[in-house]
């Protein structure tokens, strides 16, 4: 995938989130999804390339990120299966109610107080809006939990990347009662990195 200034460089552990989604929606099983904070589009496009029965939305608040997503979408000839949407507030997204089978996201999750301590090659060159998750790294997750139940079909899945175990504990305390825990996934270092919920 092509990346450049203004977009997050995909991380290896994010591949595990894609693999998890494909376990629930394997090749040939049709579904409609949203990739929130799509960045370069790598998550959404990887899903579409692996499962030809999927269609999706790639959503981001950054016009620069969406330009890269559009470049990658065109490169992989997936314009007819991935729509791109600029949105900063999940509550205002132009998505029909209960229309999605799953939502997947690698959102900004680094606590604001830890931004200054990031490695220079990350802090100085990658877009802060793709990294800075506000207080405790939880700002966008809170918005997700308020809005996403309205977008997901009953039984729909929410698959999230996180900062790790301590943040997941905080998320479990914040998540809407409309969601049931399905799975937690370890990254390559044995840290709980991803969490999956199902809408009741």
State each model region's role.
Residues 11-12, 164:
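Helix N-cap/beta->alpha junction signal
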Residues 1-8:
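Dynamic helix-loop-helix/coil hinge segments at AAA+ ATPase domain boundaries and subdomain interfaces
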Residues 109, 198-200:
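C-terminal beta-strand of the catalytic ATP-binding
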Residues 2, 135-197:
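Conserved Class I SAM-dependent methyltransferase catalytic core
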Residues 109-140:
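Mobile active-site "lid"/loop adjacent to the S-adenosyl-L-methionine
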Residues 21, 47, 122, 144-148:
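Class I S-adenosylmethionine-dependent transferase superfamily signal
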Residues 9, 16-117:
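Conserved SAM/SAH cofactor-binding pocket of Class I
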């Amino acid at each position: 995938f092509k990346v450049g200034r203004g977009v997050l460089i995909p991380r290896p552990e994010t591949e595990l989130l894609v693999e998890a989604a494909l376990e629930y929606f394997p090749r040939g099983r049709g579904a409609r999804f949203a990739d929130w904070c799509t960045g370069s589009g790598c998550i959404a496009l990887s899903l579409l390339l692996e499962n030809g029965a999927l269609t999706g939305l790639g959503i981001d608040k950054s016009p620069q990120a969406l330009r890269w997503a559009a470049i990658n979408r065109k490169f992989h000839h997936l314009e007819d299966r991935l729509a791109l949407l600029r949105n900063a507030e999940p509550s205002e997204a132009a998505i029909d109610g209960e229309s999605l089978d799953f939502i997947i996201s690698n959102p900004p999750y680094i606590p604001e107080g830890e931004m200054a301590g990031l490695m220079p090659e990350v802090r100085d060159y990658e877009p802060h809006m793709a990294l800075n998750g506000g207080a405790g790294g939880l700002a966008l997750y809170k918005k997700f939990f308020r809005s996403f139940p309205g977008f997901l079909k009953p039984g729909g899945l929410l698959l999230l990347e996180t900062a790790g175990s301590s943040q997941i504990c905080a998320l479990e305390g914040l998540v809407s009662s409309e969601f049931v825990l399905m799975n937690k996934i370890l990254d390559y270092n044995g840290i709980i990195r991803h969490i999956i919920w199902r809408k009741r």
